[in-house]
Protein backbone atom coordinates (compact mmCIF):
# COMPACT_ATOMS: atom_id res chain seq x y z
CA UNK A 1 0.00 0.00 0.00
CA UNK A 2 1.38 3.39 -0.97
CA UNK A 3 -0.31 6.36 0.70
CA UNK A 4 2.97 8.25 0.88
CA UNK A 5 2.95 9.08 -2.82
CA UNK A 6 0.17 11.63 -2.20
CA UNK A 7 1.17 15.08 -0.89
CA UNK A 8 -0.30 15.98 2.50
CA UNK A 9 -0.70 19.50 3.90
CA UNK A 10 -0.55 19.31 7.72
CA UNK A 11 -3.67 20.73 9.36
CA UNK A 12 -3.78 18.49 12.44
CA UNK A 13 -1.69 18.24 15.60
CA UNK A 14 -0.43 14.77 14.66
CA UNK A 15 -1.67 11.32 15.70
CA UNK A 16 -4.92 11.63 17.64
CA UNK A 17 -4.98 10.16 21.16
CA UNK A 18 -6.61 6.86 22.04
CA UNK A 19 -8.52 7.12 25.32
CA UNK A 20 -9.81 4.17 27.36
CA UNK A 21 -13.50 4.52 28.21
CA UNK A 22 -13.18 2.76 31.55
CA UNK A 23 -16.36 3.95 33.24
CA UNK A 24 -18.55 3.33 30.20
CA UNK A 25 -17.02 -0.13 29.78
CA UNK A 26 -17.68 -0.96 33.44
CA UNK A 27 -21.23 0.39 33.26
CA UNK A 28 -21.94 -1.96 30.35
CA UNK A 29 -20.74 -5.01 32.26
CA UNK A 30 -16.98 -4.90 31.86
CA UNK A 31 -16.78 -7.79 29.40
CA UNK A 32 -15.85 -5.53 26.45
CA UNK A 33 -13.09 -2.91 26.63
CA UNK A 34 -14.10 0.33 24.93
CA UNK A 35 -11.68 2.97 23.70
CA UNK A 36 -12.11 6.22 21.75
CA UNK A 37 -9.79 7.67 19.12
CA UNK A 38 -10.33 11.40 19.46
CA UNK A 39 -10.62 12.83 15.97
CA UNK A 40 -12.69 15.56 17.63
CA UNK A 41 -9.45 16.83 19.21
CA UNK A 42 -7.25 16.61 16.11
CA UNK A 43 -6.70 20.26 15.21
CA UNK A 44 -6.59 23.84 16.41
CA UNK A 45 -8.66 24.91 13.40
CA UNK A 46 -12.17 25.60 14.75
CA UNK A 47 -12.40 22.37 16.78
CA UNK A 48 -11.22 20.13 13.91
CA UNK A 49 -12.89 16.80 13.27
CA UNK A 50 -12.76 14.02 10.70
CA UNK A 51 -13.05 16.33 7.67
CA UNK A 52 -9.86 18.13 8.70
CA UNK A 53 -7.96 14.86 8.33
CA UNK A 54 -9.46 14.45 4.84
CA UNK A 55 -8.72 18.03 3.85
CA UNK A 56 -5.01 17.47 4.41
CA UNK A 57 -5.02 15.56 1.11
CA UNK A 58 -7.29 17.97 -0.78
CA UNK A 59 -5.41 21.17 0.07
CA UNK A 60 -2.25 20.32 -1.96
CA UNK A 61 -4.48 19.71 -4.99
CA UNK A 62 -6.30 23.03 -4.47
CA UNK A 63 -3.02 24.92 -4.18
CA UNK A 64 -1.57 23.18 -7.24
CA UNK A 65 -4.61 24.27 -9.27
CA UNK A 66 -4.21 27.89 -8.19
CA UNK A 67 -7.66 27.99 -6.60
CA UNK A 68 -8.58 31.05 -4.54
CA UNK A 69 -11.98 29.96 -3.18
CA UNK A 70 -13.00 26.75 -1.41
CA UNK A 71 -16.62 25.86 -2.21
CA UNK A 72 -18.38 23.25 -0.10
CA UNK A 73 -21.84 22.09 0.93
CA UNK A 74 -23.70 20.55 3.84
CA UNK A 75 -26.71 20.99 6.06
CA UNK A 76 -27.31 24.09 8.16
CA UNK A 77 -25.32 22.56 11.03
CA UNK A 78 -22.70 20.89 8.85
CA UNK A 79 -19.38 20.04 10.51
CA UNK A 80 -17.86 19.75 7.04
CA UNK A 81 -18.58 23.35 6.08
CA UNK A 82 -17.26 24.67 9.40
CA UNK A 83 -13.99 22.78 8.87
CA UNK A 84 -13.69 23.99 5.27
CA UNK A 85 -14.23 27.58 6.46
CA UNK A 86 -11.47 27.14 9.04
CA UNK A 87 -9.03 25.72 6.50
CA UNK A 88 -9.81 28.55 4.06
CA UNK A 89 -9.13 31.13 6.77
CA UNK A 90 -5.91 29.35 7.71
CA UNK A 91 -4.72 29.37 4.08
CA UNK A 92 -5.85 32.93 3.32
CA UNK A 93 -8.42 31.75 0.78
CA UNK A 94 -12.04 32.74 0.25
CA UNK A 95 -14.82 30.34 1.16
CA UNK A 96 -18.34 29.85 -0.17
CA UNK A 97 -20.63 27.48 1.73
CA UNK A 98 -23.98 26.14 0.58
CA UNK A 99 -26.07 25.20 3.62
CA UNK A 100 -29.15 23.18 2.68
CA UNK A 101 -32.15 22.34 4.84
CA UNK A 102 -31.15 18.74 5.50
CA UNK A 103 -32.77 18.31 8.92
CA UNK A 104 -36.48 18.52 9.73
CA UNK A 105 -35.86 20.26 13.02
CA UNK A 106 -37.24 23.67 13.91
CA UNK A 107 -35.63 25.98 16.44
CA UNK A 108 -35.55 29.80 16.33
CA UNK A 109 -31.74 29.83 16.57
CA UNK A 110 -30.92 26.71 14.52
CA UNK A 111 -29.34 28.72 11.69
CA UNK A 112 -27.61 31.23 14.01
CA UNK A 113 -25.58 29.14 16.45
CA UNK A 114 -23.22 26.19 16.39
CA UNK A 115 -21.32 25.30 13.24
CA UNK A 116 -22.93 27.89 10.99
CA UNK A 117 -22.18 30.67 13.49
CA UNK A 118 -18.51 29.65 13.53
CA UNK A 119 -18.36 29.57 9.72
CA UNK A 120 -19.71 33.12 9.56
CA UNK A 121 -17.23 34.27 12.20
CA UNK A 122 -14.40 32.89 10.06
CA UNK A 123 -15.52 34.99 7.10
CA UNK A 124 -17.24 32.40 4.93
CA UNK A 125 -19.90 33.45 2.43
CA UNK A 126 -22.75 31.34 3.82
CA UNK A 127 -25.68 30.71 1.48
CA UNK A 128 -28.84 29.16 2.92
CA UNK A 129 -30.78 26.97 0.49
CA UNK A 130 -34.13 25.27 1.16
CA UNK A 131 -33.30 21.96 -0.60
CA UNK A 132 -33.59 18.79 1.49
CA UNK A 133 -31.14 16.04 2.43
CA UNK A 134 -29.14 14.06 -0.10
CA UNK A 135 -25.55 12.76 -0.03
CA UNK A 136 -24.94 13.08 -3.78
CA UNK A 137 -23.75 15.95 -5.99
CA UNK A 138 -26.09 18.93 -5.62
CA UNK A 139 -27.18 21.54 -8.16
CA UNK A 140 -26.97 24.30 -5.52
CA UNK A 141 -23.29 23.50 -5.01
CA UNK A 142 -22.56 23.53 -8.74
CA UNK A 143 -24.36 26.88 -9.02
CA UNK A 144 -22.22 28.28 -6.19
CA UNK A 145 -19.05 27.29 -8.03
CA UNK A 146 -20.32 28.91 -11.21
CA UNK A 147 -21.06 32.13 -9.32
CA UNK A 148 -17.43 32.22 -8.16
CA UNK A 149 -16.25 31.78 -11.76
CA UNK A 150 -18.59 34.51 -12.98
CA UNK A 151 -17.06 36.86 -10.40
CA UNK A 152 -13.57 36.10 -11.70
CA UNK A 153 -12.57 33.65 -8.97
CA UNK A 154 -11.08 30.17 -9.18
CA UNK A 155 -13.25 27.79 -7.14
CA UNK A 156 -12.06 24.49 -5.72
CA UNK A 157 -14.91 21.99 -5.31
CA UNK A 158 -15.22 20.14 -2.00
CA UNK A 159 -18.37 17.96 -2.01
CA UNK A 160 -20.36 16.96 1.06
CA UNK A 161 -18.11 15.13 3.50
CA UNK A 162 -15.27 15.37 0.94
CA UNK A 163 -16.72 12.04 -0.11
CA UNK A 164 -17.29 12.41 -3.85
CA UNK A 165 -13.86 14.02 -4.22
CA UNK A 166 -11.36 11.64 -5.89
CA UNK A 167 -8.99 12.05 -2.92
CA UNK A 168 -11.68 12.00 -0.22
CA UNK A 169 -10.85 8.54 1.12
CA UNK A 170 -7.13 9.04 1.63
CA UNK A 171 -7.25 10.68 5.06
CA UNK A 172 -8.78 7.65 6.71
CA UNK A 173 -6.40 5.25 5.05
CA UNK A 174 -3.92 7.28 7.07
CA UNK A 175 -6.13 6.82 10.15
CA UNK A 176 -5.73 3.04 9.85
CA UNK A 177 -1.97 3.31 9.47
CA UNK A 178 -1.91 5.57 12.52
CA UNK A 179 -3.93 3.06 14.56
CA UNK A 180 -1.52 0.26 13.63
CA UNK A 181 1.40 2.31 14.93
CA UNK A 182 -0.49 3.05 18.16
CA UNK A 183 -1.42 -0.63 18.56
CA UNK A 184 2.28 -1.50 18.44
CA UNK A 185 2.84 0.90 21.34
CA UNK A 186 -0.19 -0.38 23.27
CA UNK A 187 0.77 -4.02 22.82
CA UNK A 188 -2.57 -5.21 21.46
CA UNK A 189 -4.78 -4.94 18.39
CA UNK A 190 -8.36 -3.73 18.36
CA UNK A 191 -10.92 -6.35 17.46
CA UNK A 192 -13.41 -3.84 16.06
CA UNK A 193 -13.54 -0.19 15.00
CA UNK A 194 -16.92 1.56 15.23
CA UNK A 195 -17.53 4.59 13.01
CA UNK A 196 -20.47 6.75 11.96
CA UNK A 197 -21.27 6.68 8.23
CA UNK A 198 -23.31 9.09 6.09
CA UNK A 199 -21.51 10.30 2.96
CA UNK A 200 -19.15 7.35 3.16
CA UNK A 201 -15.52 8.36 2.68
CA UNK A 202 -14.54 8.05 6.35
CA UNK A 203 -15.56 4.41 6.53
CA UNK A 204 -14.31 3.80 2.98
CA UNK A 205 -10.83 5.00 3.87
CA UNK A 206 -10.82 2.87 7.01
CA UNK A 207 -11.94 -0.21 5.06
CA UNK A 208 -9.03 0.21 2.66
CA UNK A 209 -6.54 1.00 5.41
CA UNK A 210 -7.50 -1.96 7.57
CA UNK A 211 -7.74 -4.27 4.55
CA UNK A 212 -3.95 -4.05 4.48
CA UNK A 213 -3.81 -6.33 7.53
CA UNK A 214 -7.00 -8.32 6.94
CA UNK A 215 -9.36 -6.32 9.15
CA UNK A 216 -11.60 -4.55 6.61
CA UNK A 217 -14.73 -6.28 7.89
CA UNK A 218 -13.86 -5.36 11.49
CA UNK A 219 -14.72 -1.75 10.66
CA UNK A 220 -18.34 -1.49 11.81
CA UNK A 221 -20.14 1.41 10.20
CA UNK A 222 -23.19 2.79 11.99
CA UNK A 223 -25.50 4.40 9.45
CA UNK A 224 -26.76 7.86 10.41
CA UNK A 225 -28.18 8.80 7.01
CA UNK A 226 -31.41 6.80 7.33
CA UNK A 227 -30.77 6.11 3.62
CA UNK A 228 -28.53 3.08 4.18
CA UNK A 229 -28.55 1.59 0.70
CA UNK A 230 -27.30 4.85 -0.82
CA UNK A 231 -24.68 5.14 1.92
CA UNK A 232 -23.56 1.52 1.49
CA UNK A 233 -23.19 1.97 -2.28
CA UNK A 234 -21.18 5.14 -1.78
CA UNK A 235 -18.87 3.58 0.83
CA UNK A 236 -18.18 0.62 -1.45
CA UNK A 237 -17.58 2.74 -4.53
CA UNK A 238 -15.25 5.16 -2.71
CA UNK A 239 -13.38 2.27 -1.07
CA UNK A 240 -12.78 0.59 -4.42
CA UNK A 241 -11.51 3.82 -5.96
CA UNK A 242 -9.30 4.57 -2.96
CA UNK A 243 -7.87 1.04 -2.98
CA UNK A 244 -6.71 1.62 -6.54
CA UNK A 245 -5.19 4.99 -5.65
CA UNK A 246 -3.07 3.60 -2.80
CA UNK A 247 -2.23 0.37 -4.64
CA UNK A 248 -3.77 -1.87 -1.98
CA UNK A 249 -3.12 -4.94 -4.07
CA UNK A 250 -6.54 -6.54 -3.74
CA UNK A 251 -10.10 -5.75 -4.67
CA UNK A 252 -12.61 -4.41 -2.18
CA UNK A 253 -15.59 -6.78 -2.09
CA UNK A 254 -19.09 -6.26 -0.70
CA UNK A 255 -18.28 -8.32 2.40
CA UNK A 256 -15.61 -5.76 3.35
CA UNK A 257 -18.26 -3.09 3.94
CA UNK A 258 -20.17 -3.67 7.18
CA UNK A 259 -22.96 -1.16 7.81
CA UNK A 260 -25.35 -1.51 10.74
CA UNK A 261 -28.62 0.13 9.71
CA UNK A 262 -30.51 -0.02 13.02
CA UNK A 263 -29.55 3.37 14.47
CA UNK A 264 -30.07 5.97 11.73
CA UNK A 265 -33.69 6.78 12.54
CA UNK A 266 -36.06 8.39 12.82
CA UNK A 267 -34.37 10.30 9.98
CA UNK A 268 -31.16 12.15 9.21
CA UNK A 269 -30.32 14.70 11.89
CA UNK A 270 -33.07 13.68 14.30
CA UNK A 271 -32.17 11.59 17.36
CA UNK A 272 -34.08 8.61 18.68
CA UNK A 273 -34.60 8.07 22.41
CA UNK A 274 -31.73 5.58 22.29
CA UNK A 275 -29.43 8.16 20.74
CA UNK A 276 -30.31 10.73 23.41
CA UNK A 277 -29.70 8.16 26.14
CA UNK A 278 -26.29 7.34 24.62
CA UNK A 279 -25.32 11.03 24.41
CA UNK A 280 -26.20 11.64 28.06
CA UNK A 281 -24.64 8.38 29.28
CA UNK A 282 -21.34 9.07 27.53
CA UNK A 283 -21.28 12.66 28.78
CA UNK A 284 -22.03 11.72 32.40
CA UNK A 285 -19.72 8.71 32.60
CA UNK A 286 -16.78 9.94 30.52
CA UNK A 287 -17.15 13.70 30.05
CA UNK A 288 -17.08 13.01 26.32
CA UNK A 289 -19.56 14.96 24.21
CA UNK A 290 -21.34 13.49 21.20
CA UNK A 291 -24.02 15.03 19.00
CA UNK A 292 -27.56 14.08 17.87
CA UNK A 293 -26.71 13.93 14.15
CA UNK A 294 -23.64 11.70 13.92
CA UNK A 295 -21.66 10.61 16.97
CA UNK A 296 -24.67 10.15 19.21
CA UNK A 297 -26.00 7.61 16.73
CA UNK A 298 -22.72 5.72 16.44
CA UNK A 299 -22.35 5.79 20.23
CA UNK A 300 -25.90 4.43 20.52
CA UNK A 301 -24.96 1.67 18.09
CA UNK A 302 -21.81 0.70 19.97
CA UNK A 303 -23.53 0.72 23.37
CA UNK A 304 -26.42 -1.35 22.07
CA UNK A 305 -24.12 -3.87 20.41
CA UNK A 306 -22.32 -4.35 23.74
CA UNK A 307 -25.62 -4.82 25.56
CA UNK A 308 -26.82 -7.32 22.94
CA UNK A 309 -23.63 -9.36 23.19
CA UNK A 310 -22.63 -8.69 19.58
CA UNK A 311 -18.99 -8.17 20.57
CA UNK A 312 -17.33 -11.30 21.95
CA UNK A 313 -16.33 -11.17 25.64
CA UNK A 314 -12.80 -9.82 25.92
CA UNK A 315 -13.09 -7.76 22.74
CA UNK A 316 -11.31 -4.45 22.48
CA UNK A 317 -13.45 -1.97 20.55
CA UNK A 318 -12.20 1.36 19.20
CA UNK A 319 -14.81 4.09 18.81
CA UNK A 320 -13.81 6.67 16.19
CA UNK A 321 -15.01 10.00 17.60
CA UNK A 322 -15.33 12.12 14.46
CA UNK A 323 -16.39 15.41 16.08
CA UNK A 324 -19.78 17.13 15.94
CA UNK A 325 -20.09 18.68 19.40
CA UNK A 326 -20.16 22.27 18.01
CA UNK A 327 -23.68 21.50 16.75
CA UNK A 328 -25.03 20.80 20.24
CA UNK A 329 -26.09 24.41 20.84
CA UNK A 330 -28.39 24.20 17.81
CA UNK A 331 -30.32 21.47 19.65
CA UNK A 332 -30.64 23.47 22.85
CA UNK A 333 -34.35 22.70 23.11
CA UNK A 334 -33.65 18.98 23.40
CA UNK A 335 -30.90 19.44 25.97
CA UNK A 336 -32.47 22.33 27.89
CA UNK A 337 -32.32 20.32 31.11
CA UNK A 338 -29.18 18.37 30.26
From Swiss-Prot:
User: What is this protein identified as?
Assistant: 1-aminocyclopropane-1-carboxylate deaminase
Gene symbol of the encoding locus: acdS
* Pfam families found in the cross-reference section: PALP
Q: List the Gene3D superfamilies hit by this protein, alphabetically.
A: 3.40.50.1100
The record describes the protein's role as:
Catalyzes a cyclopropane ring-opening reaction, the irreversible conversion of 1-aminocyclopropane-1-carboxylate (ACC) to ammonia and alpha-ketobutyrate. Allows growth on ACC as a nitrogen source.
State the species of origin: Burkholderia orbicola (strain MC0-3)
Q: EC number(s)?
A: 3.5.99.7
Q: Which residues carry this modification: N6-(pyridoxal phosphate)lysine?
A: 51
Q: Name one GO molecular function term.
A: 1-aminocyclopropane-1-carboxylate deaminase activity
Q: Which reaction does it catalyse?
A: 1-aminocyclopropane-1-carboxylate + H2O = 2-oxobutanoate + NH4(+)
HAMAP family assigned to the protein according to its UniProt record, in alphabetical order: ACC_deaminase (MF_00807)
Task: Name the active site residues.
Answer: 78
Q: Which GO terms describe its biological process?
A: 1-aminocyclopropane-1-carboxylate metabolic process; amine catabolic process
Taxonomic placement: Bacteria, Pseudomonadati, Pseudomonadota, Betaproteobacteria, Burkholderiales
Subunit structure of this entry? Homotrimer.
Q: Which cofactor does it need?
A: pyridoxal 5'-phosphate
UniProt keywords, alphabetically: Hydrolase, Pyridoxal phosphate
The entry's family comment says: Belongs to the ACC deaminase/D-cysteine desulfhydrase family.
